[in-house]
Design a protein with these regions (language model features):
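Tandem CBS (Bateman) regulatory domains
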Residues: 1-12, 47-86, 90-100, 115-136
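The conserved cystathionine-beta-synthase
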Residues: 15-34, 40, 84-102, 108-110, ...
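Acidic (E/D-rich), amphipathic helical modules within compact regulatory domains
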Residues: 23-61
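Append "Primarily bacterial transcriptional regulators
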Residues: 44, 112-113
Length: 136
């Protein structure tokens, strides 16, 4: 199975630009009900990610007023070397990679590192189960 059948499209995932604030990242996570925000530049090149876990750890570590924390620039805290998968990869490799790295959400990029979408582990498993049920 190709990974492209399991990708959440760009208009259905949290995306912000690298000049956004942490509050915008949280707003996007809440809007799309996902625990990751993808950071892109103007040509959709993936620049980084920040997860709800990253933000939770920052809050505990920083110990500053929430208003000051939320107004900080995302670039101060984002992971600018995220794990990704290529759009041409297959589902088995992708799921093995996610399992091995304990990743729930994996950005999908093309050869130019442009963001294509996101694989969310639970949604991928849901589709796999649906396919198995149909076959039986």
């Amino acid at each position: 199975m190709k990974i492209e059948d399991f990708i959440i499209k760009l208009d259905q995932i949290p995306i912000i630009n690298k000049d956004s604030m942490l509050k915008e990242a949280l707003d996007e996570m809440e809007k799309f009900k996902l625990g990751i925000v993808l950071i892109i530049d103007t040509d959709n090149t993936l620049k980084g990610v920040i997860t709800d876990g990253d933000i939770r750890r920052l809050i505990l570590k920083e110990q500053k007023p929430m208003s000051a924390f939320l107004s900080e620039d995302i670039s101060k805290h984002a992971n600018f070397f995220p794990k990704t998968i290529n759009v041409n990869d297959n589902l088995l490799n992708t799921l093995n990679f996610m399992n091995k790295n304990r990743i729930w959400d994996l950005p999908v990029i093309d050869e130019g590192k442009r963001l294509v979408g996101l694989v969310h582990l639970h949604l991928a498993l849901e589709k796999i189960i649906e396919n198995l049920v149909k076959k039986n």
